[in-house]
Design a protein with these regions (language model features):
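Short, acidic loop-to-helix structural element flanking the phosphoryl-transfer center
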Residues: 19, 27, 35-67, 78, ...
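Conserved phosphoryl-transfer catalytic core
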Residues: 1-9
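Asp-based, Mg2+/Mn2+-dependent phosphohydrolase catalytic module
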Residues: 73-74, 78-171
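Conserved phosphate-coupling serine/threonine residues in phosphotransfer and NTP-handling enzymes
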Residues: 70
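Alpha-helix C-terminal capping segments
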Residues: 22-27, 54-58, 151-156, 168
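N-terminal alpha-helical segment
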Residues: 3-4, 18, 73
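A metal-dependent, Asp-based hydrolase signature
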Residues: 8-35
Length: 171
């Protein structure tokens, strides 16, 4: 398991392609393996699209510019975004496997702010990891913990997209 985690971290940092990662794990057909895993074992929360349509910025309407900041294998993220039709919901997509930095490293948060041309005070960071949230708080970014696992966190917490919409409307 440790070897698999190390290889996944390397793939998520962009040091290994998805194909090389899966070959090192012993899969004979890495492309088919990736597709099977992403299509059958990772699901999109049914609440996301209605949430994004309600709160996201649209032509002629105020709203949030959503940015995806993900620790992921670059090819997997691209595949999932296309599979679920998510590109239209995000102003930008920043993936650890493409930028060779990962959460909770301060560098990826600074990179994101610079790339977006935003100050920390203009942003709200929503994540399922308390460690990632604590790292952004140090930069002055407001945070919301998407907490479905009962993880300890002292700040704002939500368990679903309906609750997240309520919190964001209050900010």
């Amino acid at each position: 398991v440790l070897r698999e985690e190390q290889l996944f971290t390397r793939a998520g940092n962009g040091e290994l392609s998805s194909e090389d990662f899966l070959k090192k794990l012993g899969y004979a057909d890495p492309v088919e393996t990736m597709q099977d895993y992403l299509e059958h074992y990772l699901t999109l929360d049914a609440g996301f699209k209605p949430f994004a349509e309600k709160l996201g910025k649209r032509p002629g309407r105020e709203g949030y510019d959503f940015v995806l900041l993900s620790n992921d294998v670059a090819e997997w993220n691209t595949y999932l975004m296309e599979l679920h039709g998510l590109n239209a919901y995000f102003e930008d997509v920043i993936v650890s496997g493409q930028v060779h930095m990962r959460k909770p490293q301060e560098s990826i948060f600074r990179y994101t702010l610079d790339r977006l041309g935003c100050s920390a005070g203009e942003c709200v960071f929503v994540d399922n990891s308390a460690a990632n949230l604590r790292a952004t708080e140090k930069l002055g970014i407001r945070t919301v913990h998407f907490n479905r696992d009962g993880e300890d966190y002292e700040g704002r917490q939500v368990e679903n997209f309906r609750e997240l919409a309520e919190v964001l409307e209050e900010l």
